[in-house]
Amino acid sequence: MGFGDLKSPAGLQVLNDYLADKSYIEGYVPSQADVAVFEAVSSPPPADLCHALRWYNHIKSYEKEKASLPGVKKALGKYGPADVEDTTGSGATDSKDDDDIDLFGSDDEEESEEAKRLREERLAQYESKKAKKPALVAKSSILLDVKPWDDETDMAKLEECVRSIQADGLVWGSSKLVPVGYGIKKLQIQCVVEDDKVGTDMLEEQITAFEDYVQSMDVAAFNKI
């Protein structure tokens, strides 16, 4: 198992393909598996690898919670497609004296008792919440306007990037291109969200992260279901 060399374009492509239908490296919540792979990626993936970039930006937002994420961090070769071998650690990046920056801002030290307790508490809370079936789920229908930089922006790629955003409580719907003038068209796309899981701030943050394609995002309509 593995992703090849995650410092190389080929390895990032394997990661992008792997995440095409997944939100996380393992399971349905951020875990130490995501931390292990994130730390092996030296910089944000390019915009055309939209699945990998979406995952990278999402996991980066958990910087302060790194130690408390569930699971046990394993070697890179324990994650990824079964038919690909991990080679990320075969180069100079194995050295502890390299200049790579730990984007999580901490060393691989032993987990403190407080961090362990906090992680176990959060995991227990998550499992408890998952086991309870809510009587009523509040949902909203949102219409988003996603604007490109200019008339040369690849709108098909822009829409692909937007739809690559996956989250529990988010369902993408229909879309269309709407002329705005000077040959420029904006993407108008519908989505349904569960209010306690997905907000417009989260959508805007993840959509505008595709900055090579997206200039801005606006909420055109918002209706409770």
From Swiss-Prot:
Q: What does this protein do?
A: Catalytic subunit of the guanine nucleotide exchange factor (GEF) (eEF1B subcomplex) of the eukaryotic elongation factor 1 complex (eEF1). Stimulates the exchange of GDP for GTP on elongation factor 1A (eEF1A), probably by displacing GDP from the nucleotide binding pocket in eEF1A.
The biased composition feature labelled Acidic residues covers 96-113
The segments labelled Disordered in the record are 78-115
At which residues is N6-acetyllysine found? Answer: K7
**Induction remark:** By homocysteine (HC), may mediate accelerated synthesis of free thiol-containing proteins in response to HC-induced oxidative stress.
Phosphothreonine-modified residues are where? T88, T93
Cross-link type Glycyl lysine isopeptide (Lys-Gly) (interchain with G-Cter in SUMO2), placed at K147
What keywords were assigned to this record?
Answer: Acetylation, Elongation factor, Isopeptide bond, Phosphoprotein, Protein biosynthesis, Ubl conjugation
The gene is EEF1B2
Xref: InterPro entries = eEF-1beta-like_sf, EF-1_beta_acid_region_euk, EF1B_bsu/dsu, EF1B_bsu/dsu_GNE, Glutathione-S-Trfase_C_sf, Transl_elong_EF1B/ribsomal_bS6, Transl_elong_EF1B_B/D_CS
Q: List the protein's name.
A: Elongation factor 1-beta
Q: Give this protein's Gene Ontology molecular function annotations.
A: guanyl-nucleotide exchange factor activity; translation elongation factor activity
